Amino acid sequence: MKSTSQIILITGATHTGKTALAQKLLEKYKFPYLSIDHLKMGLIRSSNTTLTPTSADEALTEYLWPIVREMIKTAIENNQNLIVEGCNIPFDWQKDFEQDYLANIKYYCLVMSKKYIQTHFDDIKKYANVIENRLDDSGCTIDIIIEENKQMQESAIKHRVNYVLIDDEYKIQIERKENKCLQ
């Protein structure tokens, strides 16, 4: 299978800017994006699952990932570009794709450093609703954000996957297949 499509997977802890980055790439490059949260809520609200928005992340990933991965394969087979963003992308995602598919997929895990979070926590809270309305953000504390990002970075290192460390400033560059910069 020869495909020129590009699939961009964006994951990371809560409040790292996954949806905002996907929206920015959509606007600049006209790549459509799939929010895994939207898929999750559609399946929950239509009663196609017994899971709830507060179900454990592991259970949600186990349920959602097989659907998302097959959507990715379909996009590649149809030579279409797609951005997929959400926290329900497993760290071992590569095992689900043959090499022909992997050649079309770029994976980015967004991680904020402890220093960045401590220095910019007010900004993190301020931009929390820049793309999606969070109904209840009271659980977003500096300690939780630090811990989730620490766990995300440790898991990325353990599984040897690409991660983008947001340390001094929030600036993320993503390369296109043609070596042009997506920003």
Regions of interest found by a model, annotated:
Residues 14:
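The conserved Walker
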Residues 17:
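Conserved glycine(s) of the Walker
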Residues 10:
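Hydrophobic anchor at the beta1->P-loop junction of P-loop NTPases
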Residues 1-5:
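Phosphate-binding P-loop
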Residues 59-104, 108-112:
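Glycine-rich phosphate-binding loop used to anchor ATP phosphates in small-molecule kinases
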Residues 23-67:
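Conserved substrate/cofactor phosphate-moiety recognition/catalytic segment
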Residues 105-149:
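A glycine- and Lys/Arg-enriched "phosphate-lid" helix/loop adjacent to the NTP-binding pocket
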Residues 130-175:
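Small-molecule kinase domains that catalyze NTP-dependent phosphoryl transfer to phosphate-bearing small molecules
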